[in-house]
Regions:
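Extracytoplasmic "Venus flytrap"
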Residues: 4, 8-29, 50-54
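Periplasmic-binding protein-like
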Residues: 69-79, 99-101, 140-141, 191-207, ...
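Extracellular glycoside hydrolase catalytic/binding regions
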Residues: 96-126
Length: 358
């Protein structure tokens, strides 16, 4: 006999990054359907959903509403780091947990967040370690003007400097902004070996379109490779052919040409992981996340999350978009998350060095 538990879903169905949220939402709903149909599990989930509509000011109130007005203590959602940080105080107030299924910039370890996707030692650093010897050492950074863009550029700048490279430019625009003339003009003048694109949603699609036009000019046909740690299959339709040749890093790419990418797949896996953590353990949904993970490990389940920092171990895959599909270039085996970059990438020690504190 299954027991039914409320879970929250806090993902935008509209707004400037709707394609990303759409893929994650479908992944969550698929995971719920699979868990509810799995008779080997004694839990089923009932979805309590709220739509922030891509507006940052709606995330915290809607998170509060889910936690206050339902029995849900676990919420799946948020796409941007700004929205994640908005809801953490509400999670702390009500004892909730956010299952965060998308890549982020690291330098965070909340007791109330399950970081299921990749952090920089699992995406950005492997990507740069491939790019610098393969493409050249003259880099240009462009990103959305919030913590994701800032931190990705900061970490990348340090990595480029360590390789004796140069950062030719480091520019930011507001999320959703598509006024890119000054950036395109600068790239035309500087001719970098590669561009790290940390733009989000509509801004990224507009940038790729403008860059595709620039590549038609003499002297650019064979250069201007774009790197990304947040572009997946779920954005290929929105970006169109302008994204061709983009090189992305992540823990999972569609093996047979699907359109959801890792945003869909990690969201789906996250629902399954929660179900396994709660299976056979009535009342465990109200436990602190680290305690839930540790106690499940003691019951025979091997958790996806490291109980010391609540980040998932993930492989690092580098792939290039060709003919609308990502083709793998390089794959590293699953890496323990190092959200604060407290150890050198590639060092022999691969165990956690941090402990989550509430």
């Amino acid at each position: 006999m299954k027991r039914t538990l409320d879970i929250g879903v806090l993902l935008s169905r509209s707004g400037m990054y709707a394609a990303l949220a759409y893929a994650s939402r479908l992944g969550v709903l698929q995971g719920v359907a699979e868990v509810n149909a799995d008779h080997t599990l004694d839990v089923a989930f009932r979805v309590v959903e709220r739509d922030p509509e891509g507006r940052l000011d709606r995330y915290a109130p809607l998170c509060r509403e889910i936690l206050r007005d339902s029995q849900a203590r676990h919420i799946f959602g948020c796409i941007t780091s700004a929205s994640r940080k908005e809801v953490i105080p509400e999670l702390e107030r009500f004892g909730g947990v956010l299952w965060y299924p998308v890549p982020y910039e690291g330098f965070e370890a909340s007791e109330h967040v399950a970081y299921m996707h990749a952090c920089p030692n699992q995406h950005l650093i492997p990507l740069l370690d491939w790019a610098l010897p393969s493409l050249g050492k003259r880099a240009y950074f462009v990103g959305s003007n919030y913590i994701w863009g800032w931190e990705m550029a900061r970490i990348a700048r340090e990595r480029v400097a360590a390789a004796a490279g140069d950062v030719l430019g480091d520019r930011y625009i507001a999320v959703g902004d598509t006024d890119l003339d000054h950036i395109i003009q600068e790239i035309r003048a500087l001719k970098p070996d590669f561009i790290l694109n940390s733009l989000v949603g509509d801004s990224s699609y507009a940038f790729l379109a403008r860059l595709a036009e620039l590549k038609q000019e003499a002297g650019f046909q064979s250069g201007l490779t774009v790197l990304s740690c947040n572009f997946t299959e779920c954005e290929v339709e929105s970006a169109g052919s302008a994204a061709e040749g983009l090189v992305s890093a992540g823990p999972w790419f569609e093996p047979e040409g699907g359109s959801g990418g890792s945003f869909h797949e990690i969201a789906r896996q996250s629902v399954h992981e929660l179900a396994k953590l709660l299976h056979g353990r009535p009342g465990a949904d109200v436990l602190p996340l680290s305690e839930l993970v540790q106690s499940a490990a003691g019951s025979g389940h091997t958790p996806r999350l490291d109980p010391t920092n609540l980040h998932a171990r993930q492989p690092a895959i580098i792939a290039r978009l060709l003919n609308g599909r990502f083709q793998e270039i390089k794959r590293l085996p699953p890496l323990a998350a190092d959200p604060y970059l407290t150890r050198q990438f590639g060092a022999s020690h691969d165990g956690p060095l941090l402990k989550v504190v509430s």
